[in-house]
Amino acid sequence: MDALTALWLPVLVSAAAVWFWHFLSWAALSLHGKDWDGLPDEDRFTNALRELNIPPGNYVFPHDDARARSSDPEFKARFKAKWQAGPIGLINVWPAKMSMGGKMIGSFLVNLLVSALIAYLASITLKPGDGFLRVTQVVVTAGILSYSFAQLHTGIWFNAKPRAMIMAVIDGVVSGVLIGVIFAAMWPGG
C-alpha cells in the first residue's frame, strides 16, 4: 500500500487531534502548570537580564568552552571553581514580544511529520483490511514511542521535575492512543 496516498487523511486528522490534545493539556486544562516554578525574586532577575541585553537564545552557566578547556589550564581552574560554587543552570531567552503563532504552526508540522512516519511504519507492517485491534496495537505503540520517551532524556539531562516527566509521558500516551484509534478507524479496507 502506498502510505502517502492511502493514509493521507489519517495522517492529517491524527496530527490535528494530537495538536488539539496538546492545546487542551497545556492551555485549556493547565495540566502542566505545576511543571515550572517561579523565581523567588523574578523582577530583580528579569531586570538583570534586561540590563545585560542578552539576545534570544539558549544559554548554560557556567559555560564549558571545550576548546579553551582543552588548552588552557587557567580556564580549567576557573571553570572547576564556578562548577563547585554554583549555581549551575540553563536559560532559554525569548524575544520580548514572542508570537505563539509560529510555535503552534511548528508543533503542528512536527505532529504531521510524526504521523507521516507512523503511517509509513504502519504501511510496511500492516495490510489493507487488518482489523481495528491489530492496527491500534501497532500504531499506538509507535505513537507512544514517538511522543513519550524522547521527553525522558530531555527531563533527565535538563533537570525536569519528576512530575513534569510523568506528565510528558502521559501526554505521549494520550497522543499515541489518539493516533492509533484514528488510524484504526480510517484504515484502508477496515
State where each predicted segment sits:
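Juxtamembrane/disordered regions of integral membrane proteins
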Residues: M1-G190
